[in-house]
Design a protein with these regions (language model features):
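Juxtamembrane extramembrane loops of integral membrane proteins
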Residues: 1-36
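Beta-lactam-recognizing serine transpeptidase/beta-lactamase-like catalytic domain environment
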Residues: 6, 142-152, 195-240, 245-479, ...
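Short beta->alpha transition motifs characteristic of CBS
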Residues: 8-13, 19, 115, 203-209
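Flexible, solvent-exposed loop/hinge segments and secondary-structure transition points
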Residues: 10, 178-198, 206, 348
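Envelope-exposed proteins and targeting segments
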Residues: 10-14, 52-54, 90, 105-110, ...
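Small/polar-residue-rich segments within soluble enzyme cores
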Residues: 16, 26-33, 47-158, 475, ...
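Extracytoplasmic/secreted proteins, especially bacterial periplasmic and envelope-associated proteins
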Residues: 26, 30, 41, 57, ...
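Conserved, well-ordered alpha-helix/loop/beta-strand core segments that scaffold catalytic motifs
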Residues: 146-189
Length: 519
């Protein structure tokens, strides 16, 4: 939204010409004092350089002001050297070169990525668009027609990227996430905010962030690459948020309607294995809204078996499970959806997969899949690039649609069902003044081959306002300790984030929008 997140600045490499140095002690003293380096180490390397070297680097990526201070000191000492009072800093050399700078330090670090000492981009935007940002000649594919490509003129200064990220919303998401980790004792967390109509990502907050200006500290912040941006890289079992997709498939195949009822006995047998509801209790006669409201596993297993494995997995594939979304950030994981015919697929998997167990997804995959429900059946491709400016011309990136897995009627029906289910239970996810659709998720984490209820992935995905969706928010808290349930942890975080979102995006409450529309 018009704020600079990554730019360019001039830094300096400071070294010495070993053939012309006259006073190594003066150089070691001046450089150590100005740059905060160890004098003894500097004098040792200057006096005992590696064999065969004529030029020795003392420091690199030195701030321009510090380099200027040393240059001025060198000039002053050269004037004194003319009188024979000092050897000066003869031999000290300065080489300028560009370095990527990040004015907001750690803000959105997981989205931006960084450029290393050699000028190569790693992670995020920096890696995915490395050729564009580095100023190399590039070819851009316009996503509205994959058969057409347009040349963008080569300009050595590189390309200015305009992102979809809303700076203030990103900062708010990071603050809310940090507070949520403390409040609920969670190990890690993620909040993603997207426009479900276009796929424009407005914020991607993760709990581990680094000051990109100090990229060399990467190893001290992260244990592995998936931790840099778990929103796109880290796979996990989503749990009950996936029930949205199972219900969508059941409605779309006319397996059920919202008013279809069944007798919930609390357990069901599939593939020789008994599956129970989350609370191990029967819930009696329920319709499909009650199925969602009470998040009944038995209901989902019944839906999947009535549809049949072929229908169920065809829909899950159409929703993109097990596939890359195509997000324009480096490091995306595809996750995995086992299907009949795979060596490790068993009949019971049809049942467990129906309520989000035994499926590996990323948060961005769930956002893409559920966008079909919020967007009249059309699934969007999440992206962070809004446009590019080159040669004074702006090239905007149009929305991409990844398919139409369900009908618009199914999407509208399910949205209303989800909204009713939240309202009926007075969910902590509700947002005053706005009707919201969404679903909680509580997925037990497998430990040594067994699921442990004390360790869960708590989540909530929701969107609104439901009559004109302008935002979709996904909250994922890993291993909350205050409560394992998504309804008690992720849901209130969603509500807080949504209330901030409608303010920052200037979305009026439902009654005001309805009054305006009726005029």
């Amino acid at each position: 939204n018009g704020r600079l997140l990554a730019g360019q600045k001039t830094v300096y490499e400071i070294g010495i010409d070993l053939n012309t140095v006259t006073d190594p002690h003066a150089i070691a003293f001046a450089v150590s004092r100005e740059l905060g380096l160890n004098y003894d180490q500097l004098i040792n390397v200057i006096q005992s350089p590696p064999e065969g070297l004529s030029y020795l680097v003392l420091a690199d990526f030195v701030d321009a002001q510090k380099a200027l201070n040393l240059q001025e000191l060198k000039r002053a000492l050269q004037e004194q050297a003319a009188t024979g009072t000092t050897g000066g800093l003869t031999g000290l050399q300065f080489k300028s070169h560009p370095q990527r700078s990040y004015p907001e330090n750690a803000l959105a670090s997981n989205i931006l990525g960084f450029v290393n000492r050699e000028g190569k981009g790693y992670f995020g935007i920096e890696e995915n668009y490395d050729n564009l940002l580095a100023g190399n000649a590039v070819r851009v594919l316009i996503p509205t027609d994959p058969n057409k490509a347009y040349e963008i003129p080569h300009v050595p200064d590189g390309t200015t990227m305009i992102l979809t990220i809303n700076r203030d919303l990103q900062a708010a998401a990071e603050d809310i996430l940090d507070n949520a980790l403390l409040e609920y004792g969670a190990q890690d967390g993620t909040i993603v905010i997207m426009n479900p109509k276009t796929g424009e990502l407005l914020a991607i907050a993760v709990s581990r962030r680094m000051n990109l200006n100090n990229f060399w500290n990467y190893d001290t912040v992260y244990n592995n690459a998936t931790e840099f941006n778990p929103a796109i890289s880290k796979t996990y079992e989503p749990g009950s948020v996936l029930k949205i997709l199972t219900m969508a498939a059941a409605l779309d195949t006319n397996t059920v309607t919202p008013n279809t009822t069944y007798l919930d006995t609390g357990a069901v047998l599939i593939g020789g294995v008994t599956i129970q509801n989350w609370d191990r209790n029967p819930w009696g006669v329920q319709n499909m809204v009650g199925c969602l409201q009470h998040s009944l596993n038995v209901c989902m297993v019944n839906l999947a078996t009535q549809m049949g494995a072929n229908n169920f997995y065809t829909y899950m594939d159409a929703f993109g499970l097990g596939h890359l979304t195509g997000i324009d950030l480096a490091g995306e994981s595809a996750g995995r959806l086992k299907i009949p015919g795979d060596a490790d697929w068993y009949p019971v998997d049809l049942g467990t997969n129906s309520f989000g167990q035994g499926v590996a997804v990323t948060p961005i995959q769930m956002m893409a899949a559920v966008s079909a429900v919020a967007n009249d059946g059309r699934m969007v491709t999440p992206h962070v690039l809004f446009g590019m400016v080159r040669d004074g011309r702006q090239y905007d990136v149009p929305a991409q649609f990844a398919g139409t897995p369900i009908s618009a009627q199914t999407a509208d029906t399910l949205t209303e069902m989800l909204a009713l289910s939240l309202e009926s239970e007075a969910s902590l996810a509700l947002v005053p003044g706005y009707r919201i659709a969404g679903k909680t998720g509580t997925a037990e984490i497998p430990v040594n081959g067994f699921y442990d209820i004390s360790q869960t992935n708590a989540s909530f995905i929701g969107w609104g306002p439901i009559d004109d969706p302008q935002f979709m928010i996904y909250v994922w808290l890993e291993k909350p300790t205050v409560s394992p349930w998504g309804a008690e942890t992720a849901a209130p975080v969603f509500s807080e984030m949504a209330q901030k979102t409608v303010i920052l995006l200037d979305i009026p409450p439902d009654f005001i929008r309805q009054q305006i529309a009726s005029q």
